[in-house]
From Swiss-Prot:
Entry keyword annotation includes Coiled coil: yes
GO process terms (BP): actomyosin contractile ring assembly actin filament bundle convergence; conjugation with cellular fusion; mating projection actin fusion focus assembly; mitotic cytokinesis
Name of the protein in its database record: Uncharacterized protein P8B7.02
Compartments where found: Cytoplasm
Annotated GO CC locations: mating projection actin fusion focus; mitotic actomyosin contractile ring
Positions in coiled-coil regions: 16-147
Keywords of this entry: Coiled coil, Cytoplasm
Length: 261
């Protein structure tokens, strides 16, 4: 067998090996693309979670304004009460109910803030995991690139770059959102503490005002009772006197009046 015949006999074997290598590369590329698609879906879910967090923060801001407005109304009502010194039973019940509802709202509000912080930490952890996965995909791409098949890998390289860009953008957005959320959380905590203190002050003022009101009422009642007893005593004394004594008292009174005239 000459050299030409030997070369021809080797070609089918080389073509078969090349086909196998290309087939393996194709399968691995498809697997990598599927993995990238999963990561893209995961990033989309993280975006939705972040949007929900933004909406929730805006809702909490709105509720904070409502609580502040409600607290200002209570301040106005309490100031009006202290100025007038008059508090009916219905107003006392209403103020107690408003204070109770305010504390319940604040406790529920604080609990919701804690839940949001937990959700945001979970979202940040998932984003970090997605970043590590993208780095691993890039490593796999570099390994395949070293096999000198740029035509086969071009699509996967492009997908990997897009995925990395998307992850980087998502991480920046999450960092900004986390910073805003932290600032809002600090302000919310201060407002929560302030509202709790104000509510307690309202209850103390209400208690003191009720004590003062009760003391005044008891004093007036005692004074009225004493006056009534004095009048009754005077009437009894007058009725016990005889007609002649009354006439003498009246004459004495008239003489005193004439003397002043």
């Amino acid at each position: 067998m000459n050299d030409e015949e030997s070369h021809i006999s080797v070609l089918p074997v080389m073509n078969k090996q090349t086909s196998l290598v290309l087939q393996n590369l194709k399968e691995e590329t498809e697997n990598q693309l599927k993995e990238l698609e999963k990561k893209r879906s995961q990033l989309h879910k993280e975006e939705q979670i972040n949007l929900q967090l933004v909406y929730a923060i805006n809702d909490l801001r709105s509720k904070t304004k409502e609580l502040k407005a409600e607290n200002e109304k209570e301040d106005t009502f309490l100031n009006s009460f202290n100025a007038s010194g008059d508090l009916t039973a219905n107003k006392k019940i209403q103020l107690r109910e408003q204070s109770r509802k305010l504390e319940e709202s604040l406790l529920s509000y604080h609990k919701k803030v804690k839940e949001m912080e937990k959700q945001h930490r979970s979202a940040s952890s998932k984003l970090e995991l997605a970043k590590l996965s993208a780095q691993q995909l890039q490593t796999n791409v570099n390994v395949l690139r070293s096999q000198n098949n740029p035509e086969i890998l071009q699509d996967m390289i492009s997908e990997t770059k897009d995925c990395r860009s998307l992850i980087a953008e998502q991480l920046l957005q999450s960092a900004s959102l986390l910073n805003d959320f932290q600032n809002d959380s600090d302000r919310i905590a201060k407002n929560h503490s302030s509202l709790i203190d104000t509510s307690r002050a309202h209850r103390v003022s209400l208690t003191n005002a009720t004590k003062n009101y009760t003391h005044i009422f008891d004093s007036l009642l005692t004074f009225t009772r004493h006056d009534s007893e004095d009048v009754s005593t005077s009437v009894e004394k007058l009725t016990s006197k005889k007609i002649s004594e009354l006439e003498k008292l009246f004459a004495d009174y008239c003489s005193i009046e004439d003397a002043f005239d």
